[in-house]
Amino acid sequence: MSVKASGGSSLARPQLYQTFAVSAISQAEQQDRFLEGSELNELTRIFQSGSLRLEIAETLTENADLIVSRAANRIFTGGSPLSYLEKPVERQPALVGASSDSRNGSVTYAESNGGGGLFGGLRSVFSSTGPIPPGFRPINIARYGPSNMQKSLRDMSWFLRYTTYAIVAGGPNIIVVNTRGLKEVIENACSIDATIVRIQEMRAASADYFRANAQAKEIVLQYFDILLSEFKAPTPANKVRQGPSNDIQGLELPQSYFNASAKRQKYAMKPGLSALEKNAVIKAAYRQIFERDITKAYSQSISYLESQVRNGDISMKEFVRRLAKSPLYRKQFFEPFINSRALELAFRHILGRGPSSREEVQKYFAIVSNGGLPALVDALVDSQEYSDYFGEETVPYLRGLGVEAQECRNWGMQQDLFSYSAPFRKVPQFITTFAQYDRPLPDQHVYGSGNDPLEIQFGAIFPKETRNPSKRPAPFNKDTKRILIHRGPAVNNQVGNPSAVGEFPGSLGAKVFRLNGGLPGAKVGKNTGTSVKFGESSTQALIRAAYRQVFGRDLYEGQRLSVAEIQLENGDISVREFIKRLAKSELFLKLYWAPHYVCKAIEYMHRRLLNRPTYGRQEMNQYFDIASKQGFYAVVEAMIDSKEYSDAFGEDTVPYERYLTPGGLQMRSARVGSIREDIGQRVDKEVTPRFVELGQVSNLRTEPEIAYRSNQGVYRQRQQTKVFKLTSNYDKVAVKNAIRAAHRQVFERDLEPYIINSEFTALESKLSNGEINVKEFIEGLGTSELYMKEFYAPYPNTKVIEMGTKHFLGRAPLNQKEIQQYNQILASQGLKAFIGAMVNGMEYLQTFGEDTVPYRRFPTLPAANFPNTERLYNKLTKQDKELVVPSFTPVVKVGG
């Protein structure tokens, strides 16, 4: 994998701590239910005690120095420890007429003799702060050193601050996250026993401020006890991400991140669970596999599988396997998607994560391509990773942020895959991103394709990712510059020719509006001189161009900056100053800065004021820094007061579009009405096929020669052939004509009535009455005694076959193979079988059907069949017994 690969820039906000309210709501949301009674009662208790906890935190904050000083005096000797305490910078409070205590009616439980002074020190000597560790020894300040003293006092202040935070939050999670594991860190610089003593001293000092309120004192003691226990606890081990594959990154998640994140409840199907607990486990499996509780949302369930897993007939692992193979899952998560996207969703549902690498995608893509959904499900469920994480009893869960360490190479895609809208995205994300690692950088913004505007007349339209999301992460580094197309002569681009920045584009670029040198507001600059080229004789035309350039449209009368317009017309300000005032106006601020995030606003302003897209991260980061430290107006001044603006536009020119992205140019060229005939036309050399070249005439031919050649080959007799087709038995004339045509085709002559015997009379009557069709009539003529006498008995079998194909198929035999086939039928089964094979064959049915009398077909393929058919028809029937088909001239003389 490329070391410069980008896994996307999806924004994630890790949870820094937990509160009971957030945890309860998160658990209810994960289980798709409302808050239970016990949870509501606990929330009620927390909210009711909120005022008291705020007052406790306020009291401890106001007396923090005294509390820390008392604890420091307990463990340090030989000086004043409090002088080493560095207080955090505090904002100056706003001046108000009355204090907040008098307005809110709050009561502060601080007492004048609570913790400081001489009596407070004596009280601390005789009061019990808890058991003192046996290894505790006071620390001399001079030997400890100023640096260590500052760190020690800072740690004491932090401990007190964490306690107040936890009291306000209503839960000890802040203390757990920030204190557990500090024991090993502090023991390198300070004694653990001394730290325990000072925490106990702060506990006693804080409790002394609430002697009048038992409930408040109990809360303070409770949280300090938690602080002590968490500090004494050993440092927990990091959570290591498991994975049997070599291409999966071995990552670790600190335990503090795991403790701070929202807990994801794990469900396991145990034999001893109650019916309600088993139902909860089954619903959790539905929520994981189908991303919703299908029994609650759609009143659907797979009852026979539920019964089996409840009774212990199948394990939860097998239950997950069968759910993923069910028709419901196939319909929702497999059939609507291509294989690569279905694979990504299957990873989410079964393993609780997205694909990790390209190699993993390739492996499972081959499985789903060869075996379909069942093979993919079996491969995932039977994997070693599934066994390590979930085993046989645990329901799969999402292993997202805070549950385990996340990989950077699929960061953005995995965060999107965990969202509820993942099934609505049809485009595969993982394989698309992995494939882009080895490809050139795309034509998009360095901070995401969602920042690329459509470069149309009314400005930049940034697409939202709510419908048909198209964001594509790309590994743009700080040295990458985008390729921009110059609107003007190519030799004048500012990258290859920096000295030509101030050159006007002419007819190849946008129209330039420049204040004429004779008008009051014109000033002579670097690229102006005394030339009046592109000069405007009317300041109103220039003002309209400035509005359109800066705002993208004409403004209403009430939105125009009339004062600035008058000053420009009077020559008090330059065009550059006029553009700056437009960009600093309230309308520009509301349109293009306030509604958008910084990256989008900077890109928009850059295209409006400097009239080109940004090059890369270096340029964007400079504007980011200015925007964060100085704000909107400083960004405007940085653009308009830049050297590039001065070189390109000077003091008297309205900014005009100088550069485009390739994508923007393509969108403009593809619009209806903007496509030119000489652009986008691909000129390909016409390649003449070989058979056409061979058929072309190489010399000039005269008309007599052409007439002579046109008479060769198949002559006009083919077009003059009369086809007899019997469509109705009621037309006796047509029946009679068809009968006579059949006689001429089969017997090669007309048969007079006195020759026709009773056999033919019966056939003609049946044909006239509709009892038989023309095909059966032809077959009856061929099997008659007259045909046998005239065309079978006097000739050898090969000659009989030639005449049979002539009479019944209208052609000569195709080749020796056909003669051999019919010869075998004729020799073994006789004339009737031979006639039946031809008349009932597929060739006869396709050519003549059941109602057409056979006729000469003038076949031209194969090439040798036409002359054979011609010779067969032109020769008299009983002229000789010479065969037609064996008349081919041999290529090699036999016996020569």
Curated annotation (Swiss-Prot):
Residues the entry annotates as binding (2R,3E)-phycocyanobilin: 190
PROSITE patterns referenced in this protein's UniProt entry, alphabetically: PBS_LINKER (PS51445)
Subcellular compartments: Cellular thylakoid membrane
Membrane topology classification: Peripheral membrane protein
Membrane-spanning ranges: none
Subunit-level organization: Heterodimer of ApcF (a variant beta-allophycocyanin). Phycobilisomes of this organism are composed of a two cylinder core, from which six rods radiate. The core is mainly composed of allophycocyanin alpha and beta chains and of minor components.
Name this protein carries in UniProt: Phycobiliprotein ApcE
Gene: apcE
